[in-house]
């Protein structure tokens, strides 16, 4: 099930970013809606907001996505870990958002943001991931973000 699908540009970003398009994979409708709203207001393009593995994979295969923000628990038999493995195999950055980060998360994600989190912490986490992807100096790491030393 798609919670919302946004195609095209939202607000223009002030400067070129490593991350412009985000896929939100979240099974809790209120959290999904909040994430989508916060991301759009910050100028990111939300490729889609989905609640299960199958829809996430469809978006990854058919749309340009720079970052996958994935909860661990999803509707259906597969989890956010399965989504992350697929996304990582396609060369995409993954940020887990979960109360309990998977023990092997460093093998498929850039970081894990602990739930519950504030909107500013989600946006700051994306800023940190952008710095990691560009190889630049890291900004302040927000509360609740565990950044992995390496991926894979």
Region locations from a protein language model:
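Conserved phosphotransfer cores of two-component systems
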Residues: 61-63, 86-92
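Charged docking surfaces used in two-component/phosphorelay signaling
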Residues: 33-37, 41
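A Lys-centered signature of the CheY-like receiver
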Residues: 115
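Conserved phosphotransfer microenvironments
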Residues: 70-88
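Conserved acidic carboxylate
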Residues: 26
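Acidic, metal-coordinating helix/loop segments flanking the phosphotransfer/catalytic sites
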Residues: 36-37, 49-67, 75
């Amino acid at each position: 099930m798609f919670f919302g699908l946004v195609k095209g540009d939202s607000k223009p970003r002030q400067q070129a970013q490593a991350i412009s398009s985000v896929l939100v994979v979240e099974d809790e409708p209120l959290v999904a809606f909040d994430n989508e709203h916060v991301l759009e207001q910050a100028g990111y393009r939300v490729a889609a907001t989905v609640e299960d593995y199958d829809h996430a994979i469809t978006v990854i295969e058919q749309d340009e996505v720079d970052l996958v923000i994935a909860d661990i628990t999803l509707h259906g038999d597969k989890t956010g870990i399965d989504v992350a493995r697929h996304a990582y195999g396609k060369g995409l950055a993954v940020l887990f958002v979960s109360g309990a980060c998977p023990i092997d998360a460093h093998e498929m994600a850039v970081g894990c943001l602990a739930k519950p989190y504030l909107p500013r912490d989600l946006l700051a986490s994306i800023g940190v991931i952008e710095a990691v992807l560009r190889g630049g100096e890291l900004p302040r790491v927000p509360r609740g973000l565990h950044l992995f030393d390496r991926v894979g």
